[in-house]
């Protein structure tokens, strides 16, 4: 019997949760339940466009689904409320039937003017290429190790994990590599330490007041393509998140108005404690003044928390260039590509398809929604 693609009915949420648990496990399902109300219903952007969740159904059995939530995107002088897809998954017993592609096509049809994809796997990338998406850029991820010995030992264990006589010998050298790595990284971090200059002061965990609306208005004039970062969106994204605890650093000038901010959180990866710079935002014209002040603050914070490694991703080119002075390593492997489906005849296409026009960060994806 043919599979029907349609919007989820309320009584089918349990079946959707069962598929999620099959793919990611019961613990991840608990996180997904906790963020469902927040991400899909209390999101401020739902005031102008509702979240949507499509299911693939055969004989009343849900076999797969794709969800999407709205987000406000500014492109040049135009603000769009776009649908952002997430959680595309198919039940393991219904794969190789083209269901994933049909679900994405349903999303594209509803998305209208612009469809979005952050493709986290080669299979997803191939699917979106086939559907006509254009690669905008692969978000660069950059790193700063803090506890060199732990980082080097952990990475060495992964590199030498495969069983072979040579790897067994190399594994014995892991403590030596860790000690050497500690010294090299300590020296590099000393050389690449941020120094606060100017008269900016940093406030930790400020209230997102009207000053952040003013910052958004001023900074967004200099950034052609960016998702909304006004006070209400910041409150929802970083204060009301039911899963992740975020810490905010705001740089203020003598008038008290924010000149920029950084948002960070903590996670674990490969037995390492990872500090993530979720966003670092300021007018690009003030990046040289603001980034160093904020970086000095969140580096001290991460050191006090015993973080092993710091990561950041994307950002506007001017902001990224300043941050790269202090986060000097690039992550190995392929980056997560950002892809968009927008007619080349659309007057906004040139801006959307130009990587140097964007400010995109960890916070614009959903990586921290499930720790």
Predicted regions, residues:
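Charge-rich interaction segments
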Residues: 169-222, 232
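Non-catalytic N-terminal targeting/anchoring module and adjacent flexible stem/linker
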Residues: 1-11, 346-347, 370-371
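Secondary-structure boundary elements
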Residues: 109-114, 252, 256
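A conserved beta-strand-loop-helix scaffold within acyl/acetyltransferase catalytic domains
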Residues: 3-89, 202-282
């Amino acid at each position: 019997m043919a599979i029907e693609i349609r919007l989820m009915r309320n009584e089918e949420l349990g079946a959707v949760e069962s598929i999620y648990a099959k793919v990611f496990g019961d613990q991840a399902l608990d996180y997904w339940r906790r963020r469902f109300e927040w991400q899909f219903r209390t999101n401020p952007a739902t005031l102008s466009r509702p979240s949507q969740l499509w299911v693939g159904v055969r004989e009343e059995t849900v076999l797969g689904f794709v969800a999407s939530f709205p987000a406000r995107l500014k492109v040049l002088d135009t603000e769009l409320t776009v649908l952002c897809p997430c959680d595309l998954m198919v039940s393991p017993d219904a794969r190789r039937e083209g269901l994933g592609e049909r679900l994405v096509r349903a999303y594209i049809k509803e998305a209208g003017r612009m469809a979005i994809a952050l493709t986290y796997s080669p299979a997803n990338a191939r699917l979106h290429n086939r559907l006509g998406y254009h690669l905008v850029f692969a978000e660069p991820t950059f790193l700063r190790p803090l506890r060199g010995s732990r980082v080097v030992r952990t990475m060495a264990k992964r590199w030498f994990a495969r069983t072979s006589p040579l790897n067994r010998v190399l594994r014995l050298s892991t403590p030596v590599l860790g000690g050497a790595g500690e010294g090299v990284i300590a020296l590099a971090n000393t050389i690449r330490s941020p120094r606060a200059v100017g008269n900016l002061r940093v406030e930790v965990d400020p209230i997102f007041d009207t000053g952040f609306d003013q910052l958004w208005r001023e900074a967004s004039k200099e950034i052609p393509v960016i998702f909304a970062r006004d006070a209400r969106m910041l409150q929802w994204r970083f204060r009301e998140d039911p899963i992740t605890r975020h810490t905010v650093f705001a740089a203020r000038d003598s008038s008290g108005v924010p000149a920029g901010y950084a948002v960070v959180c903590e996670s674990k990866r490969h037995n390492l404690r990872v500090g993530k710079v979720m966003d670092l935002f300021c007018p690009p014209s003030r990046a040289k003044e603001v980034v160093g002040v904020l970086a000095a603050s969140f580096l001290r914070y991460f050191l006090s928390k015993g973080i092993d490694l710091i990561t950041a991703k994307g950002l506007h080119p001017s902001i990224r260039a300043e941050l790269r002075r202090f986060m000097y390593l690039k992550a190995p492997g392929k980056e997560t590509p950002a892809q968009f489906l927008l007619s080349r005849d659309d007057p906004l296409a040139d801006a959307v398809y130009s990587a140097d026009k964007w400010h995109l960060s960890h916070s614009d994806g959903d990586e921290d929604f499930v720790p």
